[in-house]
Amino acid sequence: MKVDVLLGLQWGDEGKGKVVDVLTPKYDVVARFQGGPNAGHTLEFEGQKYVLRSIPSGIFQGDKVNIIGNGVVLDPALFKAEAEALEASGHPLKERLHISKKAHLILPTHRILDAAYEAAKGDAKVGTTGKGIGPTYTDKVSRNGVRVGDILHNFEQKYGAAKARHEQILKSLNYEYDLTELEKAWMEGIEYLKQFHFVDSEHEVNNYLKDGKSVLCEGAQGTMLDIDFGSYPFVTSSNTVCAGACTGLGVAPNRIGEVFGIFKAYCTRVGAGPFPTELFDETGDKMCTLGHEFGSVTGRKRRCGWIDLVALKYSVMINGVTKLIMMKSDVLDTFDTIKACVAYKVDGEEIDYFPYDITEGVEPVYAELPGWKTDMTKMQSEDEFPEEFNAYLTFLEEQLGVEIKIVSVGPDRAQTIERYTEE
């Protein structure tokens, strides 16, 4: 068996949570391979809305095993709140959720450091979510991190050493803070975590594959936020691309099967950073309103713009995408004209590839297509798609070189239409 990978192709918020929920019936295991509680997956299940930050989206399927992999960073306090809310709503998870011993813990002082570093940058700040993600990955790479497995071995000594080191840094930054409440909630989270299965997830995932079980790897955020290939330095601190599934779960590259790439029919970005197709007019405001574009974790208003095919082609290439999934098609239902960025103009020269740096001086070059002016939310199959919408799909497939296998026409899992079903 091979593992399939599901990931975002833009700047995050593409709708991965819903798609994982739609795909999970086909899989035995769902595993998160990177990121932390800085990104939320929003799902609507049986009329109720859920936001998952650290827990895999397969948790709503009663017979699935869910794994938090070694590439994830975990905040015990936020995990406890998320898990308790799920259990209170009728979704037990203690027997179905396994946590890698090698996953790194977000400490209370990591969150304080996050705020202190951002404050020190002034106008040059990246716009982090303040959840301590960057400082946690920094400790991981510098070999100073505290891992889930450490909860069972010399925990107090390892936590105390990390805390003391962080306090020295905060002192040098002259940053005032109060750790009392954060640390109290965090320690309660540590005790709660002990109720779950701590596993060597690399062995577990590979044993499932050896036994013929199907595994879906779930990414967080999006390709354009990848630490190496995203719009640096306005990126996250982990590898959000397909290769991250290998390092974040312990899966060999030759075990990767299908790669599902998710994108919106338009573009959004939350926080600071370059965004070539961003709209600052009423069209952008309309997208934001119709798409309910507010961050699921931070509540921040998302910046909106037309689809960027230069960046999207780059993402398809980097990830080796085999199937595309287009989300939020219905948000564009009322637009007379749909625009798509097909090239950039940089220093007066038109280019059709993603350059080293897009932080400034990038002007989008657009193709225009007629809008479909049809309510897509009630549609049940691709046979009902209007001609203009089919033309948009064909245009995108020709530009990207990959079939759009699934189209989402609303937030509910039922509002999901599969294409090319005759194959």
From Swiss-Prot:
Family matches, as InterPro entries: Adenylosuccin_syn_GTP-bd, Adenylosuccin_syn_Lys_AS, Adenylosuccinate_synth_dom1, Adenylosuccinate_synth_dom2, Adenylosuccinate_synth_dom3, Adenylosuccinate_synthetase, P-loop_NTPase
Binding-site residues for GTP, renumbered to this chain: 12-18, 40-42, 302, 408-410
GO cellular component terms, semicolon-separated: cytoplasm
Subcellular localization, as worded in the UniProt entry: Cytoplasm
Note on cofactor: Binds 1 Mg(2+) ion per subunit.
GO aspect biological process, one term: 'de novo' AMP biosynthetic process
Pathway the protein takes part in: Purine metabolism; AMP biosynthesis via de novo pathway; AMP from IMP: step 1/2
Residues noted as binding IMP in the record, renumbered to the chain: 13-16, 38-41, 129, 143, 221, 236, 300
Keywords of the record: Cytoplasm, GTP-binding, Ligase, Magnesium, Metal-binding, Nucleotide-binding, Purine biosynthesis
Residues the entry annotates as binding substrate: 296-302
Source species, domain of life: Bacteria
A Pfam entry, by short name: Adenylsucc_synt
Record's subunit section: Homodimer.
Top EC class, one word: ligase
UniProt binding sites for Mg(2+): 13, 40
GO molecular function: adenylosuccinate synthase activity; GTP binding; magnesium ion binding
Catalyzed reactions per annotation: IMP + L-aspartate + GTP = N(6)-(1,2-dicarboxyethyl)-AMP + GDP + phosphate + 2 H(+)
Coiled coil: none
Cofactor requirements of the protein: Mg(2+)
Lineage: Bacteria, Pseudomonadati, Bacteroidota, Bacteroidia, Bacteroidales
Residues at the active site: 13, 41
EC number: 6.3.4.4
SUPFAM superfamilies referenced in this protein's UniProt entry, alphabetically: P-loop containing nucleoside triphosphate hydrolases
Protein name, UniProt field: Adenylosuccinate synthetase
Family per similarity comment: Belongs to the adenylosuccinate synthetase family.
Job description of the protein: Plays an important role in the de novo pathway of purine nucleotide biosynthesis. Catalyzes the first committed step in the biosynthesis of AMP from IMP.
CDD domains: AdSS
Species of origin: Bacteroides thetaiotaomicron (strain ATCC 29148 / DSM 2079 / JCM 5827 / CCUG 10774 / NCTC 10582 / VPI-5482 / E50)
